[in-house]
Structures are given as structure tokens and as C-alpha cells.
Amino acid sequence: MSSAPADTPVYRRLRRESLTDSWLSARLGVDTGRLAAMRRAGDLIGVREPGGQAYLYPAWQFQNGKPRPLVPQLVRTAREAGLDDERLYEVMTMRVGLGGEQRLSDLLVAGQDEAVLAAVRSGARP
């Protein structure tokens, strides 16, 4: 994804459904350096904004103003499968099944943790 043009459907969706690091910093009450450390440690999913240095944090990884409990395990599973945060974002926003409207991120929000982890382990198709 990082080599794709900035004006693709994936990037438009990313910008539309994500929180900026400055907004998230204020919301969580931590500085942006701490956010970066959390992202590097695998506690948050952050995707670099196309052509920039800032990161965008998909809103679906948060519940009640905090990261969902599954996020660290999700990131760890993705890394074990060889996926970086950009590819993890792509996988999480793929449609589930043939012709389905739900995305894997919808399953995360619905608490279907095992289905989400299984899809991420496969590295692509939910």
C-alpha cells in the first residue's frame, strides 16, 4: 500500500475512517511520542499518511476511547504472518466472503475475535 498512489479507494477510506495522531493524542491524553511508541510496540495499528510523516489510526481499533483488547494480539498475529500495518489495514478492510458487505473490521467491532485472527493468519482472504 505504501507504494500505491495516495488517491486510491483504500487511502480514501483510510483518511475517512481514521484518527490523526494529534487528535488521538488529545483523546487518549498521551503525547504523540507515546503514540509512536505504542504503534511500534504493536499496541496500536497506525498507517503512514501517503506522502507524509504523520500516521493515521483506524477508528475501528478503538472502543469507548481505548484500544480494543484484541489489538495487540491482532498486530502480533499480523507480524507473525509477515504483514506490516499497511497490509494489516488492507486485510482488515477487505470484504468478508464473496459479495458480502461486511468487512473484517466489522467482525472485530462485533467481537468475532477468532474469525478476525484466523483471517489475519492467512495473510489475506477472510
Predicted regions and their residues:
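Non-transmembrane "mature" sequence context
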Residues: 1-126
